């Protein structure tokens, strides 16, 4: 036995593992063109077009507005449904506003108590040093 055969014990096993970094040759049955010229190149960046800018503006500016409108109308609808069905004593107006009288849809008049203040007494209170 020679010194080269003793130093490499894996050569006797008969297992050959090819390296990933090995340069492979093209098979003979392949077309004469090189693979890089026959397949299109992968484009990683494309400059923005007017259509892509418009599309992204609609997505980022208009859709949140529509989403907020839908959420608002959904909340109004749910509150109205709860009021009309009488779920858990839902009231449209709080108890503190019961003394008001409605004059139109969503408009109420509340009487404010007014006390008569004598102008001279009022000025005396404002200008007193006590």
Swiss-Prot record:
InterPro entries: OMP_MIM1/TOM13_mt. Residues 15-24 have a biased composition (Polar residues). GO terms for cellular component: mitochondrial outer membrane. Residues 1-41 are annotated as: Disordered. It is found in: Mitochondrion outer membrane. Keywords: Membrane, Mitochondrion, Mitochondrion outer membrane, Protein transport, Transport. Pfam families: TOM13. GO terms for biological process: mitochondrial outer membrane translocase complex assembly; protein insertion into mitochondrial outer membrane. Residues 25-41 have a biased composition (Low complexity). Belongs to the MIM1 family. Required for the assembly of the TOM (translocase of outer membrane) receptor complex, which is responsible for the recognition and translocation of cytosolically synthesized mitochondrial preproteins. PANTHER family: MITOCHONDRIAL IMPORT PROTEIN 1. This is Mitochondrial import protein 1. The lineage of its organism: Eukaryota, Fungi, Dikarya, Ascomycota, Pezizomycotina.
